[in-house]
């Protein structure tokens, strides 16, 4: 495995983060993830950024809206952050989503769904579905075009995004960035990269335990019939244990006659799209996603 200099710089930064003073393992992992924010680069200015809280009957969900200009009825991408279902926030993905809004020219709405293990499956997925439905029903208030909508997410967020796409009918496309699509962790890439970098087999088993409350097979977020899924863009990384399951999912979608665009980034690692401040390919991937979104949504 050839580690490129910029990837090594990112790994060095990650290895320098110290959270040993936090005794609670779960909290330490969450704080650790927040401390990786600088890898995304500087915080770009966006025309408007607004935080809102959606009040459902039984819970509140926060969203962050990135608006690239003051035009009305812009297309929209609803984004679900990664973090293994148990960490991540509006802040961990703020910088890449600012970049995506500026490069794509569409509204990006980031969803702060509830996290496992406090809220195991299906709470997080239901939050994502319900929030997307709320966005659709409040399109005029939000200044978006609900008929030009995509969902997107990275890692566990990609899992949630495709779960939403399978439940709702008016999603034009989905962008899945190294999505976790198989809880068995049995593909060759899990053997090849069991010790990482970034994501290990042990960590993956733990996150699926968190997400499912120990009932791993219960967390089926995918329909058996994929024929109704929207056009799909999947990004994978060569040195990523999730690589093969994402590629298998792409193949299943194609067999269901879904249009799939797929890019494998050579010598990249899990999470590289969040590391665009250090790794050039991370920023390039965001630009490529922006181009895809514009092509699919901007009429």
What label would you give each PLM region?
Residues 1-65, 298-299:
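A glycine/proline-hinged amphipathic helix-loop "lid/cap" segment
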Residues 91-110:
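Short amphipathic alpha-helix adjacent to the substrate-entry channel of hydrolases
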Residues 136-151:
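Gly/Ser-rich "nucleophile elbow"/oxyanion-hole loop immediately N-terminal to the catalytic nucleophile
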Residues 153, 157, 161:
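Gly/Ala-rich beta-loop-alpha elbow adjacent to hydrolase catalytic centers
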Residues 166-214:
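Hydrolase active-site cap/lid region
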Residues 234-236:
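Short beta-strand/loop motif that positions the catalytic acidic residue
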């Amino acid at each position: 495995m050839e580690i490129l200099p910029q990837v090594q710089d990112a790994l060095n930064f990650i290895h320098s983060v110290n959270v040993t003073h936090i005794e609670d393992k779960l909290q330490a992992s969450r704080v650790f993830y927040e401390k990786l924010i600088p890898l995304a680069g500087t915080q770009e200015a966006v025309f408007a950024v607004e935080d809102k809280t959606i009040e459902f009957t039984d819970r509140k969900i926060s969203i962050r809206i990135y608006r690239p200009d003051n035009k009305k009825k812009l297309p929209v991408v609803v984004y679900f952050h990664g973090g293994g279902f148990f960490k991540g926030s509006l802040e961990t993905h703020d910088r890449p989503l600012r970049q995506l809004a500026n490069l794509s020219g569409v509204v990006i709405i980031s969803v702060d769904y509830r996290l496992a293990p406090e809220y195991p499956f299906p709470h997080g997925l239901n939050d994502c579905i319900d929030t997307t439905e709320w966005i659709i029903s409040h399109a005029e208030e939000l200044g978006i075009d609900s008929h030009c909508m995509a969902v997107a997410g990275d890692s566990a967020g990609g899992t949630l995004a495709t779960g939403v796409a399978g439940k709702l009918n008016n999603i034009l496309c989905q962008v899945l960035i190294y999505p976790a699509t198989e809880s068995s962790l049995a593909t060759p890439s899990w053997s090849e990269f069991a010790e990482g970098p970034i994501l290990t087999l042990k960590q993956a088993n733990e996150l699926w335990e968190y997400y499912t409350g120990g009932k791993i097979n219960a967390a089926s977020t995918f329909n058996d019939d994929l024929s109704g899924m929207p056009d799909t863009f999947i990004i994978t990384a060569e040195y990523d244990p999730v690589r093969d399951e994402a590629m298998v999912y792409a193949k299943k979608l194609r067999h269901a006659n879904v249009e799939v665009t797929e890019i494998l980034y050579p010598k990249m690692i899990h999470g590289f799209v969040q590391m665009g401040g250090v790794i050039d390919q991370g920023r390039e991937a965001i630009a490529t996603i922006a181009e895809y979104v514009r092509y699919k949504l901007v009429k």
